[in-house]
Amino acid sequence: MSEEKQVGFVTMGDQRAGEDAIPEIGIGMLGYAFMGRAHSNALKKIAYVTWPPPYLPKLVAIAGRNEEAVREAARRYGYEKYSTNWEDVVSDPDVQIFDNGGPNDTHLEPTVAAAKAGKHVICEKPLGRDAEESYEIWRQVAATGVKHMTAFNYRFYPAIILAKQLIEAGEIGEIYHFRARYHQEWVMDPEFPKVWRLDKKQAGSGALGDLGAHIIDQARYLVGEPEKITGLVKTFITERPGGTVDVDDAFQSTVEFANGANGTFEATRFAAGRKNQMRWEINGSKGTLVFDAERQNELLAHFNGSTPGASAQGFRNVLVSEAYHPYWEHWWPHGHMIGWEDNFVHELLHLLTCVKDDSPISPRGATLEDGYRCAEICDAIVRSDQTGQRQTIEYRTL
């Protein structure tokens, strides 16, 4: 009787160093709160979601202003080291990608410095506090030749990518209208304190740059370039515990696109009952598409004449969870839904793939130029509110 071979454990360290080893890429993060947490979580999930990934993200260093908070974040998220000085992250030779999830007033200098140090960069939106600052970030980073990305995460929702595919295939025909709104309620209480998002020096703007930037980018991504725009900007509560509020609570706009479509943009932090509703509707000559971020796995669609019999015409609710839908080959069996956080995985996976393959960030992702163009549109909305006149949108070039 032959003796059976005892295999025992195989040491994974040997496997990782073998011929099929997947290269690591060092990540440096600025910001430990909302976006720093979301991005760190996504980076750690990439290898769980897709195998083999283009790189294995290595969480090298994280920086933030509060030492106690950034130390806790480094421990929770799994970073090797932390600092209260972003320059330590930018200068670290083990960092190849700099992820800027800090407040808006920390976008310009750290992002530019990282690019000049040879790091690929991704920066949260809004890119800068205004168009001038956003242009400077784009101009200086683009000159270095690194990959650069503005973190418009809604571009990576499978239902939104499906909508773009349907539009580009001509399924809804010529686009007539794009109507978008982004509604939240989190600052309605007059006793809610003045935080950095309510401070112009730190944030640049309020609902316009925070929420409006998303729907403006969606408009550009799905429909095309806005050409003329009007704006109404409003602050409802000007005094709060902690000081005077000098940013907007809400805005509304009418817009005319270069391709002849028209539409409306609206965002507010004063919509009672609305937690995080980013919703748009696109009407075309052959149909309509509707998306609501609070039901992110669904796309509401109507196609003229697609259902036999006039009495059965109407909208259909497409559950975007099949393996042939965008990014779903990485996830679960159909009907097993993904959530808000998972779209950051798609976003950062795209960045890693573009770095690995030396492929363009755009059009799937947003570049820093897209971030700058969004800022020009935001500034035009403010000018319209100040002057009472419709504004023509003009972009600078490099």
Roles of regions detected by a PLM:
Residues 2-21, 153, 228, 244, ...:
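C-terminal glycine/acidic-rich active-site capping loop/insertion
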Residues 57-59, 95, 175, 226:
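Core-facing hydrophobic residues within beta-strands of well-ordered domains
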Residues 5, 146, 173-177, 383-398:
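C-terminal capping/lid region of NAD(P)-dependent oxidoreductase domains
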Residues 213, 266-274, 336:
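Glycine-rich phosphate/pyrophosphate-binding beta-alpha loops
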Residues 83, 123, 129, 148-150, ...:
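Hydrophobic residues in well-ordered beta-strands that form the structural core
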